[in-house]
């Protein structure tokens, strides 16, 4: 669905095809049991289940399309300072004190949405007490266009295939204390821990990027539409990024 949206708004055409990676299979298993489930594109008569695209590439394609659109005026790097919602229109004050008016304001400004706060939309909040460690790794064995995720006792670990047959993007969700320990490890120590946690499924793993971490929280805004305002994407809801589906669910 998210790929179709990018096609429909003209952003997909700006993606470098050399950086796209289709995935034809998905495998999910539990480390402490025999539980396992697999999905295949062939089961639904498709060439692929979807594509793995780097976040930076998607941002660039969206930005390029916005720059090329005659229907969009970019006001950067200005930010919203205040919103006042009237019966007929919304009054917007930017951080340089310039003002705009609009009949509808759509907040697509992420989990910590300023638009949501200014609209006083209540939200349900849940802290998973976990951090997600993300990085790019090189694997000894090729990923064969398969997305994989293992559930470990301390949290799930996903390997998402990238354009190089031996490169994967990892999302390793761990309890906060365990994540802190993993981030303190040397690259060599981290590689060993990662390889073991993934049951050596793709052989020895090697970091080829810096490790980054972010807190995992569930947010669900109880109201998405109000007087002259609406919120979408992560501004409306965020969930645990299982199997790399967080962005897809945010878009759809």
Predicted regions and their residues:
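Glycine-rich FAD cofactor-binding loop and adjacent beta-loop-alpha segment at the N-terminus
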Residues: 1-23
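Conserved FAD-binding catalytic core of PHBH/FMO-like flavoproteins
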Residues: 6, 105-211
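Conserved N-terminal helical subregion
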Residues: 18-118, 126-131
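Short beta-strand motif preference
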Residues: 28, 92, 159, 168-170, ...
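A short, flexible beta-alpha/helix-coil linker loop
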Residues: 42-46, 140, 175-179, 236-238
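Pyridoxal 5′-phosphate
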Residues: 85-89, 143, 250
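Structural motif
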Residues: 86, 153, 162, 225-226
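FAD/FMN-dependent oxidoreductases across multiple families
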Residues: 180-252
